[in-house]
Amino acid sequence: MNIFEAYNSTKRALESAGIEDYVFEAKQIIKHITGFSNSEILMNYTNALTAFQQNNLTAIIKQRQLRYPLQYIFGEWSFYGRDFYVGPGVLVPRADTEITAEKCLDFLKAVKNPQILDLCAGSGCIGITLAKEREDAAVTLLEKFPEAARYAEKNIKRQSAVNARLLTGDVLLGDGGDKLYDLIVSNPPYIPKNEMKIISVSYTHLTLPT
């Protein structure tokens, strides 16, 4: 099976499984298993997949057919041009959340050496992005759940965000300290229980009921 055949096969399998954005996801899966960029795939679409790549492809498709989030399958996802570790217990970085980061950066344009607090930090994608885009900032990431905090800690190291620090605790218990901040941002992964029934099955993996 070559790359082009694998892409078409993946696309059909995802469409049959009812995956809404099956074209986009098929492209992401092929990129993941080959390690190729979009342009490299176009130049090498007749290349045969190795046995390892075919086995990996089959495993990914099976997991996705069960509606396990693609981002969790990969173990990472891109946000604002950077790759972040993700997995069970954290909200996956989403393209529409990049708007939040943009709004924060716009707000901070007139602020020198800003002090920033990212509540319910999860993977840390927002706080770390702000830390990388504003190297003069001091960013505190506060996360209540240890499992999610581990991802934030790994991502701080991965992105070499030396001006970001992680605190594990509950802001409602005062664990954020009494420091004054120029900006407080939060994108908590909580959805009311009565709404969980009407959202996509995939999103139930990505949220915590309240």
Predicted regions and their residues:
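Non-catalytic accessory regions of SAM-dependent methyltransferases
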Residues: 1-34, 38-42, 46-49
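A general structural signal for well-ordered alpha-helical segments in protein cores
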Residues: 7, 26, 57, 67-70, ...
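Conserved RecA-like P-loop NTPase ATPase core
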Residues: 29, 187, 203
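Conserved AdoMet
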Residues: 31-106
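Hydrophobic pocket-lining residues within nucleotide cofactor-binding pockets
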Residues: 34, 171, 208
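Conserved SAM/SAH cofactor-binding pocket of Class I
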Residues: 98-198
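Conserved small/polar residues in nucleotide/adenosyl-binding loops
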Residues: 204-210
